[in-house]
């Protein structure tokens, strides 16, 4: 057991999907996995292990934002030996040519969080995805005929911003979308020498106001999960 995860040793697979919402973790386990067991319910942050195409995979809710995902990623790696961590979630598009329902694979993540400045004072550490996971996820998506974008995303500490000026400037520098967790995931993966990736569905556009319907969001979410699972079982 760790502080926030009550699983016993061996109950969590080496490859894991990380949605922010614990109810999404439950949905993924019930919809895509077989022989499912629930290993965690501490603070309602559900975690499950099952099999996908005969291979063990776990799925763990992380909550929203850098501090929350950092807790779960630290414990999954240090206490349970997880080797491959794939965040699955939503993001808001910044670029004009990024459309709702597109799938974004984050090659790296810039951030307005000070998390890495605590480790590297006065220095900007640039965390990156694991290339093998990225390539496998990209190939799985293109084989499905999906519109996959690969590039930089913004990991933001603030959901309700007073000004979008900085987000617009980041868009000028090619940042594709905004979310709230990837920088932390990639930094911790680098620290502990494990593999990490973020696969994101565009649920809305920050500047045009376009949004997906609930039905569209669910369909695209399912495709994103299948991409992540295919990458996870090949690693």
Swiss-Prot record:
Enzyme Commission number(s) of this protein: 2.4.2.1
The UniProt entry annotates the active site at 204 (proton donor)
Tell me which stretches of the chain form a coiled coil.
Answer: none
Q: What reaction is this protein's catalytic activity?
A: a purine D-ribonucleoside + phosphate = a purine nucleobase + alpha-D-ribose 1-phosphate; a purine 2'-deoxy-D-ribonucleoside + phosphate = a purine nucleobase + 2-deoxy-alpha-D-ribose 1-phosphate
Record's InterPro entries?
DeoD-type, Nucleoside_phosphorylase_CS, Nucleoside_phosphorylase_d, Nucleoside_phosphorylase_sf
Question: Site Important for catalytic activity: which residues?
Answer: 217
Say if the entry is tagged with keyword Glycosyltransferase. yes
- Keywords on record: Glycosyltransferase, Transferase
Please name the GO terms that the record assigns under molecular function.
purine-nucleoside phosphorylase activity
Q: Which residues bind phosphate?
A: 20, 24, 43, 87-90
Q: Which residues bind a purine D-ribonucleoside?
A: 4, 162, 179-181, 203-204
Which PANTHER family does the annotation name?
FI09636P-RELATED, URIDINE PHOSPHORYLASE
Protein task: Catalyzes the reversible phosphorolytic breakdown of the N-glycosidic bond in the beta-(deoxy)ribonucleoside molecules, with the formation of the corresponding free purine bases and pentose-1-phosphate.
Q: Which NCBIfam families match?
A: deoD, PRK05819.1, PRK13374.1
Q: What do we know about how this protein assembles, alone or with others?
A: Homohexamer; trimer of homodimers.
Q: Which family does it belong to?
A: Belongs to the PNP/UDP phosphorylase family.
Specify the protein name: Purine nucleoside phosphorylase DeoD-type
The lineage is:
Bacteria, Bacillati, Bacillota, Bacilli, Bacillales
Gene from which this protein is expressed: deoD
